[in-house]
């Protein structure tokens, strides 16, 4: 019934008078729900290293909520001691929606966050052109860490402990990595290098071990950013000002 009601409330278009047209007005919610009956079951697949994984839903956060289905996450929690799920498109967009929407509606309480960083992205944030990103530039890394700092601050608003994971590439240098590590240490955040891109699971072992220890400490005090009883406009303003640094929001 919950799924059917949500489908019924989907806006599919607008009338000439700019009134929203919902699926319920087309009497199509029953048929759509029936079509989703089989698709609603998570797909159990295996990684290249024969580890189990659920692939179920994957909308990007710039167009939707940016995370997989509640069914997949809850199924995984029943089958494993630790569950890793991706909330893509940055801590300002993907993580915010994961926390405020998915976790709220599904009753989930995350134990830890891995904030993924790359030297290329940080150098780009530091003002380096795309064609020059393969060249070592420690100063650009330091300048780009201002962006990383904001993501760390955003996650802190939800009360979940965070670790920065450096997604290592073969063009990275030790000095660039050290600049990121030093920055994180100065802000009281652990930082681990992960070479899974090149070395698979073995390359992520140190990061995984650290996160498991962090989870076992049970230090998370997760809370959502806003209350359900706030108006849609107030919720939007609160997200814009607290996560994105906006002064206010305007709509016509």
Task: Provide a role label for each language-model segment.
Residues 1-252:
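Flexible phosphate-sensing "switch/lid" loops adjacent to ATP/NTP-binding sites
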């Amino acid at each position: 019934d919950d799924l059917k009601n949500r489908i019924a409330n989907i806006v599919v278009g607008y009338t000439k008078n700019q009134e929203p047209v919902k699926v319920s007005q087309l009497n199509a919610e029953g048929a759509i729900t029936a079509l989703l009956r089989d698709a609603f079951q998570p797909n159990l697949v295996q990684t290249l290293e024969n580890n189990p994984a659920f692939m179920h839903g994957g909308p990007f956060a710039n167009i939707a909520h940016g995370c997989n289905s509640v069914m997949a996450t809850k199924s995984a929690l029943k089958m494993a001691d630790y569950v890793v799920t991706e909330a893509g498109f940055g801590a300002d967009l993907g993580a915010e929606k994961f926390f405020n929407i998915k976790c709220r509606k599904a009753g989930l309480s995350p134990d830890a966050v891995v904030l993924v960083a790359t030297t290329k992205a940080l150098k780009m944030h530091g003002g380096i052109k795309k064609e020059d990103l393969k060249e070592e530039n420690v100063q650009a890394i330091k300048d780009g860490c201002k962006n990383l700092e904001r993501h760390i601050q955003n996650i802190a608003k939800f009360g979940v402990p965070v670790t920065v994971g450096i997604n290592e590439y073969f063009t990275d240098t030790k000095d660039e990595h050290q600049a990121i590590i030093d920055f994180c240490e100065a802000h009281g955040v652990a930082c681990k290098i992960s070479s899974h891109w090149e070395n698979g699971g073995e390359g992520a072992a140190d990061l995984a071990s650290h996160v498991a220890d962090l989870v076992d400490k049970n230090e998370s005090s997760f809370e959502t950013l806003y209350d359900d009883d706030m108006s849609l406009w107030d919720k939007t303003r609160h997200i814009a000002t607290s996560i994105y640094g906006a002064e206010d929001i305007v709509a016509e």
